[in-house]
Regions:
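Nucleotide/pyrophosphate-binding catalytic subdomain
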Residues: 1-87
Length: 87
């Protein structure tokens, strides 16, 4: 049976928690798909780049610029940090 595990982006930012989780996943959940967030990372990156983030009822409104930032945060920063921790 394959398990799908979703973790939030804030967890990825905490190295101690991330490393503990990755150790646990490696030991216990071999047949798993790990899905990660990264909204907080996208927000931080947007702020650094001076790109205004619009939120409505806790949901990010994604225009062209914020979509580019989201791709950088999710596919770059968050993903690479998670993969490095799993290796």
């Amino acid at each position: 049976m394959i398990r799908i595990i979703k973790i939030g982006g804030k967890l990825i930012e905490n190295d101690a928690v991330l490393n503990g989780l990755c150790d646990e996943l490696s030991a216990c959940y071999r047949d798993s798909v790990l899905v990660h967030g990264g909204g907080s990372m996208a927000g931080q990156l947007s702020a650094r780049l001076g790109i205004r983030t619009r939120m409505i009822d806790g949901r990010r409104i994604t225009g062209r610029e914020t979509l580019e930032v989201a791709v950088m945060a999710y596919a770059g920063w968050a993903n690479k940090k998670l993969v490095a921790a799993l290796q």
